[in-house]
Regions:
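Signature aromatic-anchored transmembrane alpha helix within multi-pass, membrane-resident enzymes
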Residues: 9-14, 201, 362, 368-395, ...
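Interfacial juxtamembrane loops and adjacent helix segments
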Residues: 42-92, 104-109, 113
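Specific aromatic-rich, kink-prone transmembrane helix
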Residues: 102, 130, 153, 168-187, ...
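Transmembrane-helix motifs of polytopic, lipid-linked glycan transferases
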Residues: 115-138, 176, 312-317
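Hydrophobic/aromatic-rich transmembrane helices and adjacent perimembrane loops
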Residues: 170, 215, 328-333, 344-375
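Perimembrane helix-loop-helix junctions
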Residues: 180-194, 215-250
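Membrane-interface alpha helices of multi-pass inner-membrane proteins
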Residues: 193-211, 247
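Membrane-embedded, lumen/periplasm-facing catalytic core of multi-pass transferases
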Residues: 388-453
Protein backbone atom coordinates (compact mmCIF):
# COMPACT_ATOMS: atom_id res chain seq x y z
CA UNK A 1 0.00 0.00 0.00
CA UNK A 2 2.83 2.38 0.89
CA UNK A 3 4.52 1.64 -2.43
CA UNK A 4 1.33 2.35 -4.40
CA UNK A 5 0.95 5.71 -2.60
CA UNK A 6 4.47 6.67 -3.60
CA UNK A 7 3.75 5.72 -7.20
CA UNK A 8 0.57 7.82 -7.20
CA UNK A 9 2.45 10.81 -5.75
CA UNK A 10 5.22 10.38 -8.31
CA UNK A 11 2.63 10.37 -11.10
CA UNK A 12 0.96 13.47 -9.62
CA UNK A 13 4.28 15.35 -9.40
CA UNK A 14 5.19 14.26 -12.94
CA UNK A 15 1.81 15.46 -14.21
CA UNK A 16 2.20 18.85 -12.54
CA UNK A 17 5.70 19.16 -14.02
CA UNK A 18 4.38 18.28 -17.47
CA UNK A 19 1.78 21.05 -17.22
CA UNK A 20 4.47 23.54 -16.25
CA UNK A 21 6.78 22.29 -19.00
CA UNK A 22 4.01 22.74 -21.57
CA UNK A 23 3.87 26.42 -20.62
CA UNK A 24 7.66 26.68 -20.66
CA UNK A 25 7.70 25.50 -24.28
CA UNK A 26 5.48 28.49 -25.11
CA UNK A 27 7.99 30.98 -23.71
CA UNK A 28 9.48 33.12 -26.48
CA UNK A 29 10.96 36.31 -25.04
CA UNK A 30 12.71 37.31 -21.86
CA UNK A 31 12.55 39.85 -19.08
CA UNK A 32 15.71 41.98 -18.99
CA UNK A 33 16.58 40.38 -15.64
CA UNK A 34 16.36 36.98 -17.32
CA UNK A 35 18.79 38.13 -19.97
CA UNK A 36 21.12 39.27 -17.21
CA UNK A 37 20.80 35.89 -15.50
CA UNK A 38 21.89 34.09 -18.65
CA UNK A 39 24.87 36.37 -19.25
CA UNK A 40 26.19 36.73 -15.71
CA UNK A 41 26.13 32.96 -15.23
CA UNK A 42 28.51 32.30 -18.12
CA UNK A 43 30.33 35.53 -19.00
CA UNK A 44 33.69 36.08 -17.28
CA UNK A 45 33.75 39.87 -17.54
CA UNK A 46 30.30 41.12 -16.57
CA UNK A 47 26.69 40.03 -16.75
CA UNK A 48 25.68 43.37 -18.23
CA UNK A 49 26.48 43.64 -21.93
CA UNK A 50 28.11 47.07 -22.15
CA UNK A 51 26.83 49.01 -25.14
CA UNK A 52 29.41 51.83 -25.21
CA UNK A 53 33.14 52.16 -25.88
CA UNK A 54 35.79 53.65 -23.60
CA UNK A 55 34.69 57.15 -24.66
CA UNK A 56 31.08 56.54 -23.69
CA UNK A 57 29.88 56.36 -27.30
CA UNK A 58 27.64 53.57 -28.62
CA UNK A 59 29.63 50.79 -30.25
CA UNK A 60 28.65 48.26 -32.88
CA UNK A 61 28.11 44.74 -31.56
CA UNK A 62 28.21 41.91 -34.10
CA UNK A 63 25.81 39.00 -33.78
CA UNK A 64 28.84 36.80 -33.09
CA UNK A 65 29.85 39.04 -30.19
CA UNK A 66 26.34 38.97 -28.68
CA UNK A 67 26.12 35.19 -29.09
CA UNK A 68 29.50 34.69 -27.44
CA UNK A 69 28.47 37.02 -24.61
CA UNK A 70 25.73 34.63 -23.47
CA UNK A 71 27.62 31.42 -24.28
CA UNK A 72 29.72 29.46 -21.81
CA UNK A 73 33.05 28.94 -23.55
CA UNK A 74 35.18 25.89 -22.64
CA UNK A 75 37.84 28.06 -21.00
CA UNK A 76 35.26 29.59 -18.63
CA UNK A 77 33.69 26.35 -17.42
CA UNK A 78 33.80 26.33 -13.61
CA UNK A 79 35.15 29.89 -13.55
CA UNK A 80 33.82 30.48 -10.05
CA UNK A 81 35.87 33.63 -9.60
CA UNK A 82 33.93 35.28 -12.43
CA UNK A 83 30.62 34.13 -10.96
CA UNK A 84 31.62 35.61 -7.61
CA UNK A 85 32.81 38.92 -9.05
CA UNK A 86 29.81 39.31 -11.37
CA UNK A 87 27.46 39.13 -8.41
CA UNK A 88 29.69 41.32 -6.28
CA UNK A 89 29.28 43.91 -9.04
CA UNK A 90 25.52 43.32 -9.04
CA UNK A 91 23.33 43.24 -5.92
CA UNK A 92 22.66 39.52 -5.55
CA UNK A 93 24.48 36.58 -3.96
CA UNK A 94 26.07 33.96 -6.28
CA UNK A 95 24.61 30.53 -5.51
CA UNK A 96 21.72 30.63 -7.99
CA UNK A 97 24.00 31.82 -10.79
CA UNK A 98 26.39 28.98 -10.00
CA UNK A 99 23.54 26.50 -10.47
CA UNK A 100 22.63 28.12 -13.81
CA UNK A 101 26.30 27.87 -14.80
CA UNK A 102 26.17 24.11 -14.22
CA UNK A 103 22.80 23.78 -15.98
CA UNK A 104 24.12 25.49 -19.11
CA UNK A 105 26.58 22.61 -19.51
CA UNK A 106 23.64 20.36 -20.45
CA UNK A 107 23.17 22.53 -23.55
CA UNK A 108 26.81 22.82 -24.51
CA UNK A 109 27.02 26.23 -22.88
CA UNK A 110 24.61 27.74 -25.41
CA UNK A 111 21.95 30.30 -24.58
CA UNK A 112 18.52 28.64 -24.42
CA UNK A 113 15.26 29.17 -22.56
CA UNK A 114 15.83 25.88 -20.74
CA UNK A 115 19.10 26.62 -18.91
CA UNK A 116 17.44 28.29 -15.94
CA UNK A 117 14.31 26.18 -16.28
CA UNK A 118 16.33 23.12 -15.26
CA UNK A 119 17.37 24.84 -12.03
CA UNK A 120 13.84 26.07 -11.33
CA UNK A 121 12.03 22.81 -12.07
CA UNK A 122 14.45 20.87 -9.85
CA UNK A 123 13.94 23.42 -7.05
CA UNK A 124 10.19 23.14 -7.59
CA UNK A 125 10.20 19.33 -7.38
CA UNK A 126 12.33 19.48 -4.25
CA UNK A 127 9.89 21.96 -2.70
CA UNK A 128 7.03 19.52 -3.40
CA UNK A 129 8.99 16.73 -1.71
CA UNK A 130 9.58 18.93 1.34
CA UNK A 131 5.87 19.82 1.47
CA UNK A 132 5.10 16.09 1.48
CA UNK A 133 7.49 15.67 4.42
CA UNK A 134 5.86 18.59 6.26
CA UNK A 135 2.39 17.08 5.94
CA UNK A 136 3.67 13.68 7.05
CA UNK A 137 5.27 15.31 10.07
CA UNK A 138 1.90 16.89 10.88
CA UNK A 139 0.13 13.53 10.43
CA UNK A 140 -1.83 15.01 7.52
CA UNK A 141 -0.67 12.62 4.83
CA UNK A 142 -4.13 12.45 3.26
CA UNK A 143 -3.92 16.16 2.45
CA UNK A 144 -0.79 15.76 0.31
CA UNK A 145 -2.56 15.51 -3.10
CA UNK A 146 -4.73 18.57 -2.42
CA UNK A 147 -1.75 20.65 -1.27
CA UNK A 148 0.49 19.64 -4.18
CA UNK A 149 -2.26 20.46 -6.67
CA UNK A 150 -3.19 23.77 -5.05
CA UNK A 151 0.41 24.94 -4.77
CA UNK A 152 1.96 23.28 -7.80
CA UNK A 153 -0.65 24.27 -10.35
CA UNK A 154 -1.35 27.78 -9.10
CA UNK A 155 -0.66 30.53 -11.63
CA UNK A 156 1.79 32.10 -9.21
CA UNK A 157 3.92 28.98 -8.88
CA UNK A 158 3.85 28.20 -12.60
CA UNK A 159 4.92 31.77 -13.37
CA UNK A 160 7.83 31.59 -10.95
CA UNK A 161 9.11 28.30 -12.33
CA UNK A 162 9.03 29.86 -15.80
CA UNK A 163 10.60 33.14 -14.64
CA UNK A 164 14.33 32.74 -15.07
CA UNK A 165 15.48 34.17 -11.77
CA UNK A 166 16.32 32.85 -8.31
CA UNK A 167 12.90 33.03 -6.67
CA UNK A 168 11.91 29.39 -7.11
CA UNK A 169 15.22 28.29 -5.59
CA UNK A 170 14.72 30.81 -2.78
CA UNK A 171 11.28 29.35 -2.12
CA UNK A 172 12.71 25.84 -1.87
CA UNK A 173 15.22 26.90 0.77
CA UNK A 174 12.56 28.78 2.75
CA UNK A 175 10.28 25.72 2.74
CA UNK A 176 13.22 23.48 3.69
CA UNK A 177 14.19 25.79 6.55
CA UNK A 178 10.59 25.71 7.79
CA UNK A 179 10.52 21.91 7.65
CA UNK A 180 13.78 21.56 9.57
CA UNK A 181 12.53 24.04 12.18
CA UNK A 182 9.29 22.09 12.48
CA UNK A 183 11.27 18.90 13.11
CA UNK A 184 13.23 20.65 15.86
CA UNK A 185 9.97 21.81 17.45
CA UNK A 186 8.44 18.34 17.20
CA UNK A 187 11.57 16.88 18.77
CA UNK A 188 11.23 19.13 21.84
CA UNK A 189 13.87 21.55 20.53
CA UNK A 190 16.64 18.96 20.69
CA UNK A 191 19.64 19.67 18.50
CA UNK A 192 22.16 17.07 17.46
CA UNK A 193 25.13 17.48 15.15
CA UNK A 194 23.22 16.32 12.08
CA UNK A 195 20.33 18.72 12.71
CA UNK A 196 22.65 21.69 13.25
CA UNK A 197 24.61 20.84 10.10
CA UNK A 198 21.56 20.43 7.85
CA UNK A 199 19.95 23.58 9.21
CA UNK A 200 23.22 25.42 8.68
CA UNK A 201 23.58 24.29 5.06
CA UNK A 202 20.00 25.33 4.35
CA UNK A 203 20.40 28.71 6.04
CA UNK A 204 23.68 29.58 4.35
CA UNK A 205 22.61 28.43 0.87
CA UNK A 206 19.26 30.19 1.27
CA UNK A 207 21.04 33.43 2.13
CA UNK A 208 23.49 32.94 -0.75
CA UNK A 209 20.53 32.47 -3.11
CA UNK A 210 18.60 35.64 -2.24
CA UNK A 211 18.96 37.98 0.71
CA UNK A 212 15.20 37.91 1.31
CA UNK A 213 15.71 34.44 2.78
CA UNK A 214 16.96 36.19 5.92
CA UNK A 215 13.57 37.87 6.42
CA UNK A 216 11.74 34.55 6.57
CA UNK A 217 14.45 32.85 8.62
CA UNK A 218 14.49 35.73 11.10
CA UNK A 219 10.72 35.54 11.64
CA UNK A 220 10.78 31.77 12.16
CA UNK A 221 13.87 32.03 14.38
CA UNK A 222 12.24 34.64 16.66
CA UNK A 223 9.05 32.59 16.99
CA UNK A 224 11.08 29.52 17.91
CA UNK A 225 13.05 31.41 20.58
CA UNK A 226 9.79 32.74 22.06
CA UNK A 227 8.27 29.26 22.05
CA UNK A 228 11.37 27.81 23.70
CA UNK A 229 10.99 30.27 26.56
CA UNK A 230 7.23 29.64 26.76
CA UNK A 231 7.82 25.89 26.97
CA UNK A 232 10.65 26.48 29.46
CA UNK A 233 13.11 24.61 27.30
CA UNK A 234 16.56 23.82 28.61
CA UNK A 235 18.67 26.99 28.58
CA UNK A 236 21.49 25.09 26.94
CA UNK A 237 19.18 24.22 24.02
CA UNK A 238 18.15 27.85 23.64
CA UNK A 239 21.77 28.97 23.73
CA UNK A 240 22.83 26.37 21.15
CA UNK A 241 19.96 27.28 18.83
CA UNK A 242 20.80 30.97 19.09
CA UNK A 243 24.56 30.51 18.66
CA UNK A 244 24.04 28.19 15.70
CA UNK A 245 22.20 30.94 13.85
CA UNK A 246 24.85 33.50 14.74
CA UNK A 247 27.46 31.16 13.26
CA UNK A 248 25.32 30.60 10.14
CA UNK A 249 25.05 34.36 9.65
CA UNK A 250 28.79 34.90 10.08
CA UNK A 251 29.65 32.09 7.66
CA UNK A 252 27.20 33.40 5.06
CA UNK A 253 28.76 36.86 5.26
CA UNK A 254 32.32 35.51 5.15
CA UNK A 255 31.58 33.38 2.09
CA UNK A 256 30.20 36.39 0.24
CA UNK A 257 31.61 39.53 1.84
CA UNK A 258 30.10 41.89 -0.82
CA UNK A 259 26.73 41.18 0.79
CA UNK A 260 27.60 43.81 3.40
CA UNK A 261 27.70 46.51 0.75
CA UNK A 262 24.61 45.11 -0.97
CA UNK A 263 22.55 45.05 2.21
CA UNK A 264 23.69 48.35 3.69
CA UNK A 265 24.37 50.63 0.76
CA UNK A 266 22.73 49.35 -2.43
CA UNK A 267 19.29 50.18 -3.82
CA UNK A 268 18.19 46.64 -2.92
CA UNK A 269 19.17 46.82 0.76
CA UNK A 270 17.89 48.48 3.90
CA UNK A 271 17.88 51.88 2.19
CA UNK A 272 14.64 50.74 0.56
CA UNK A 273 12.94 50.90 3.94
CA UNK A 274 12.51 54.57 3.12
CA UNK A 275 10.26 53.83 0.14
CA UNK A 276 7.02 55.77 0.16
CA UNK A 277 3.46 54.98 -0.98
CA UNK A 278 3.39 51.91 1.26
CA UNK A 279 -0.35 51.23 1.13
CA UNK A 280 -0.50 51.64 -2.65
CA UNK A 281 2.34 49.15 -3.00
CA UNK A 282 0.67 46.87 -0.44
CA UNK A 283 -2.46 46.71 -2.56
CA UNK A 284 -0.41 45.94 -5.68
CA UNK A 285 1.09 42.97 -3.87
CA UNK A 286 -2.35 41.86 -2.71
CA UNK A 287 -3.38 41.79 -6.36
CA UNK A 288 -0.33 39.71 -7.24
CA UNK A 289 -1.22 37.33 -4.42
CA UNK A 290 -4.80 37.12 -5.71
CA UNK A 291 -3.60 36.41 -9.25
CA UNK A 292 -1.38 33.63 -7.91
CA UNK A 293 -4.46 31.74 -6.72
CA UNK A 294 -6.81 32.25 -9.67
CA UNK A 295 -8.68 35.34 -8.42
CA UNK A 296 -9.57 37.92 -11.07
CA UNK A 297 -7.60 41.03 -10.10
CA UNK A 298 -9.97 43.33 -12.01
CA UNK A 299 -12.67 42.90 -9.36
CA UNK A 300 -11.65 44.51 -6.08
CA UNK A 301 -14.72 43.22 -4.13
CA UNK A 302 -13.85 39.66 -5.17
CA UNK A 303 -10.29 40.07 -3.89
CA UNK A 304 -11.52 41.47 -0.57
CA UNK A 305 -14.09 38.68 -0.14
CA UNK A 306 -11.46 36.04 -0.91
CA UNK A 307 -9.06 37.56 1.64
CA UNK A 308 -11.77 37.70 4.31
CA UNK A 309 -12.61 34.03 3.69
CA UNK A 310 -8.93 33.05 3.68
CA UNK A 311 -8.09 34.78 6.96
CA UNK A 312 -11.39 33.65 8.46
CA UNK A 313 -10.40 30.06 7.73
CA UNK A 314 -6.97 30.60 9.31
CA UNK A 315 -8.53 32.08 12.46
CA UNK A 316 -10.93 29.13 12.65
CA UNK A 317 -7.99 26.74 12.20
CA UNK A 318 -6.13 28.49 15.01
CA UNK A 319 -9.14 28.26 17.33
CA UNK A 320 -9.75 24.57 16.61
CA UNK A 321 -6.12 23.47 16.53
CA UNK A 322 -4.56 21.64 19.45
CA UNK A 323 -1.12 22.77 18.25
CA UNK A 324 -1.59 26.49 17.90
CA UNK A 325 2.13 27.16 17.55
CA UNK A 326 2.17 25.23 14.28
CA UNK A 327 -0.61 27.49 12.98
CA UNK A 328 1.43 30.52 14.04
CA UNK A 329 4.66 29.14 12.56
CA UNK A 330 2.93 28.39 9.25
CA UNK A 331 1.24 31.77 8.85
CA UNK A 332 2.89 34.56 10.85
CA UNK A 333 6.33 34.50 9.13
CA UNK A 334 4.58 34.81 5.76
CA UNK A 335 2.63 37.84 6.96
CA UNK A 336 5.82 39.37 8.37
CA UNK A 337 7.68 38.63 5.14
CA UNK A 338 4.87 40.13 3.04
CA UNK A 339 4.87 43.35 5.08
CA UNK A 340 8.66 43.72 4.82
CA UNK A 341 8.73 42.81 1.11
CA UNK A 342 6.26 45.59 0.37
CA UNK A 343 8.59 48.07 2.06
CA UNK A 344 11.88 46.70 0.74
CA UNK A 345 11.13 46.40 -2.97
CA UNK A 346 11.37 49.16 -5.54
CA UNK A 347 9.12 47.29 -7.96
CA UNK A 348 5.87 45.56 -7.03
CA UNK A 349 6.16 42.16 -8.69
CA UNK A 350 4.97 38.64 -7.92
CA UNK A 351 8.53 37.33 -7.66
CA UNK A 352 9.15 39.09 -4.35
CA UNK A 353 6.28 37.35 -2.56
CA UNK A 354 6.82 33.94 -4.18
CA UNK A 355 8.03 32.34 -0.90
CA UNK A 356 4.63 33.02 0.69
CA UNK A 357 2.77 30.84 -1.82
CA UNK A 358 3.59 27.36 -0.41
CA UNK A 359 2.67 28.53 3.09
CA UNK A 360 -0.56 30.11 1.88
CA UNK A 361 -1.32 26.77 0.21
CA UNK A 362 -0.56 24.82 3.38
CA UNK A 363 -2.61 27.23 5.48
CA UNK A 364 -5.60 27.05 3.12
CA UNK A 365 -5.65 23.25 2.90
CA UNK A 366 -5.05 22.72 6.63
CA UNK A 367 -7.76 25.29 7.43
CA UNK A 368 -10.26 23.44 5.26
CA UNK A 369 -9.26 20.24 7.02
CA UNK A 370 -10.11 21.82 10.38
CA UNK A 371 -13.42 23.11 9.00
CA UNK A 372 -14.81 19.89 7.53
CA UNK A 373 -15.89 16.95 9.68
CA UNK A 374 -17.06 14.62 6.91
CA UNK A 375 -15.62 11.13 6.61
CA UNK A 376 -14.12 11.66 3.14
CA UNK A 377 -13.22 15.31 3.68
CA UNK A 378 -9.76 14.88 2.11
CA UNK A 379 -11.39 14.00 -1.22
CA UNK A 380 -13.65 17.04 -1.00
CA UNK A 381 -10.66 19.27 -0.23
CA UNK A 382 -8.78 17.82 -3.21
CA UNK A 383 -11.76 18.56 -5.46
CA UNK A 384 -11.94 22.16 -4.16
CA UNK A 385 -8.21 22.65 -4.74
CA UNK A 386 -8.48 21.19 -8.25
CA UNK A 387 -11.44 23.40 -9.18
CA UNK A 388 -9.62 26.54 -8.01
CA UNK A 389 -6.43 25.82 -9.97
CA UNK A 390 -8.40 24.80 -13.06
CA UNK A 391 -10.17 28.16 -12.97
CA UNK A 392 -6.73 29.73 -13.19
CA UNK A 393 -5.52 27.37 -15.91
CA UNK A 394 -8.53 28.09 -18.12
CA UNK A 395 -9.11 31.79 -17.43
CA UNK A 396 -5.59 33.08 -16.94
CA UNK A 397 -2.06 32.47 -18.18
CA UNK A 398 1.39 32.43 -16.61
CA UNK A 399 3.51 35.56 -16.62
CA UNK A 400 6.85 35.93 -18.42
CA UNK A 401 5.99 33.97 -21.57
CA UNK A 402 6.47 37.00 -23.88
CA UNK A 403 4.72 35.18 -26.72
CA UNK A 404 4.28 38.35 -28.80
CA UNK A 405 8.06 38.56 -29.10
CA UNK A 406 7.83 35.83 -31.75
CA UNK A 407 6.92 38.51 -34.30
CA UNK A 408 10.11 40.45 -33.46
CA UNK A 409 12.19 37.32 -34.01
CA UNK A 410 10.46 36.62 -37.33
CA UNK A 411 11.23 40.16 -38.51
CA UNK A 412 14.84 39.70 -37.41
CA UNK A 413 15.16 36.48 -39.42
CA UNK A 414 13.66 38.15 -42.49
CA UNK A 415 16.15 41.02 -42.16
CA UNK A 416 19.17 39.19 -40.75
CA UNK A 417 21.52 40.83 -43.28
CA UNK A 418 20.57 44.29 -42.00
CA UNK A 419 21.93 46.30 -39.09
CA UNK A 420 19.81 46.74 -35.98
CA UNK A 421 19.56 49.99 -34.00
CA UNK A 422 18.05 49.63 -30.54
CA UNK A 423 16.86 52.86 -28.85
CA UNK A 424 15.84 53.05 -25.18
CA UNK A 425 16.32 55.33 -22.17
CA UNK A 426 18.49 53.43 -19.67
CA UNK A 427 21.52 51.16 -19.45
CA UNK A 428 19.91 47.77 -18.78
CA UNK A 429 16.75 46.92 -20.72
CA UNK A 430 18.67 45.99 -23.87
CA UNK A 431 19.33 42.65 -22.14
CA UNK A 432 15.72 41.80 -23.01
CA UNK A 433 16.41 41.93 -26.75
CA UNK A 434 19.51 39.74 -26.85
CA UNK A 435 17.70 37.06 -28.94
CA UNK A 436 17.16 39.64 -31.72
CA UNK A 437 20.72 40.87 -31.51
CA UNK A 438 21.93 37.32 -32.05
CA UNK A 439 20.20 37.35 -35.46
CA UNK A 440 20.86 40.77 -37.01
CA UNK A 441 24.22 41.40 -38.71
CA UNK A 442 25.22 43.92 -36.05
CA UNK A 443 23.60 46.08 -33.39
CA UNK A 444 23.99 49.66 -32.19
CA UNK A 445 22.44 50.29 -28.77
CA UNK A 446 21.45 53.92 -28.13
CA UNK A 447 20.45 55.39 -24.78
CA UNK A 448 18.45 58.61 -25.19
CA UNK A 449 19.46 59.61 -21.67
CA UNK A 450 23.11 58.90 -22.36
CA UNK A 451 25.96 61.19 -23.38
CA UNK A 452 24.53 62.54 -26.67
CA UNK A 453 24.18 58.95 -27.88
CA UNK A 454 21.31 59.80 -30.20
CA UNK A 455 23.41 62.48 -31.89
CA UNK A 456 26.22 59.96 -32.24
CA UNK A 457 23.83 57.57 -33.99
CA UNK A 458 22.64 60.25 -36.40
CA UNK A 459 26.23 61.06 -37.40
CA UNK A 460 27.56 57.50 -37.42
CA UNK A 461 29.28 56.91 -40.78
CA UNK A 462 28.95 53.15 -40.60
CA UNK A 463 25.19 53.43 -40.17
CA UNK A 464 24.78 56.21 -42.73
CA UNK A 465 26.54 54.09 -45.35
CA UNK A 466 23.78 51.49 -45.06
CA UNK A 467 20.90 51.56 -47.54
CA UNK A 468 18.45 50.51 -44.83
CA UNK A 469 18.31 49.19 -41.29
CA UNK A 470 15.85 48.02 -38.65
CA UNK A 471 15.11 50.48 -35.86
CA UNK A 472 13.69 49.43 -32.49
CA UNK A 473 12.32 52.07 -30.10
CA UNK A 474 10.70 51.46 -26.72
CA UNK A 475 7.00 52.22 -27.07
CA UNK A 476 6.88 54.44 -23.97
CA UNK A 477 9.46 56.80 -25.52
CA UNK A 478 8.39 59.61 -27.88
CA UNK A 479 8.91 57.67 -31.11
CA UNK A 480 7.90 60.55 -33.39
CA UNK A 481 10.58 62.84 -31.98
CA UNK A 482 13.30 60.30 -32.77
CA UNK A 483 11.90 59.49 -36.21
CA UNK A 484 11.74 63.17 -37.11
CA UNK A 485 15.36 63.66 -36.06
CA UNK A 486 16.39 60.80 -38.32
CA UNK A 487 14.54 62.30 -41.28
CA UNK A 488 15.86 65.80 -40.63
CA UNK A 489 19.50 64.92 -39.97
CA UNK A 490 20.24 61.94 -42.21
CA UNK A 491 19.56 60.70 -45.73
CA UNK A 492 17.08 58.17 -44.37
CA UNK A 493 13.76 59.71 -45.41
CA UNK A 494 11.57 56.59 -45.62
CA UNK A 495 10.45 55.09 -42.34
CA UNK A 496 7.84 52.33 -42.21
CA UNK A 497 6.44 50.95 -38.98
CA UNK A 498 6.56 47.17 -39.33
CA UNK A 499 5.62 46.16 -35.78
CA UNK A 500 3.85 47.86 -32.88
CA UNK A 501 4.87 46.41 -29.54
CA UNK A 502 2.28 45.63 -26.85
CA UNK A 503 1.97 47.95 -23.85
CA UNK A 504 1.75 45.21 -21.20
CA UNK A 505 4.75 45.09 -18.87
CA UNK A 506 4.73 41.33 -19.37
CA UNK A 507 5.50 41.68 -23.07
CA UNK A 508 8.44 43.15 -24.96
CA UNK A 509 7.27 46.71 -25.68
CA UNK A 510 9.37 47.65 -28.70
CA UNK A 511 8.15 49.31 -31.89
CA UNK A 512 10.03 48.24 -35.02
CA UNK A 513 10.65 50.37 -38.10
CA UNK A 514 12.23 49.74 -41.48
CA UNK A 515 14.41 52.80 -42.11
CA UNK A 516 15.62 53.36 -45.67
CA UNK A 517 16.89 56.10 -48.00
Amino acid sequence: MEKSKKIILAILIATICCVIFSFQTQKVGFHEDEGYTAASSVNPSNGLMVATDENGNPKWLTKEYVTDFVTLSPKNIFNFKALYLNQAYDNHPPFFYTMVHFASLFFGGHFTKYNVFIVNIVAFILSLIVIIKILKLLNKEKLIPATLIFYGLSMGTISMVIFQRMYMLLTFFVVLYFYQTLKIYKNNFKLDGKTITLLGITTILGFLTQYFFAIYAFAIFVLMIIQMFRRKANKELIKNYFLAHVIYAILGILIFVPCIKHLLFSDRGISNLGNGEYFLHFWEYIKHFAYAFSINTNYTPLIIIALVIFFGLIIYWFIKSKEKFIVVLTTLPSIFYFIIAVKMTSFQELRYIMPTLPFASLAFILSLDSLFTLKNKENIITIIATIIVFIGLFTSKPLFLYKDYQKCLEIAKQNSEKSFVYVYDNFFNHMQSIPEMMIYKKTLIVNTNGNNELEFMLKNDELNNESSYILSIKNYIDNDEILNKIKENTDFKNIEKIYEGPTSKYEVGNNLYLVSK
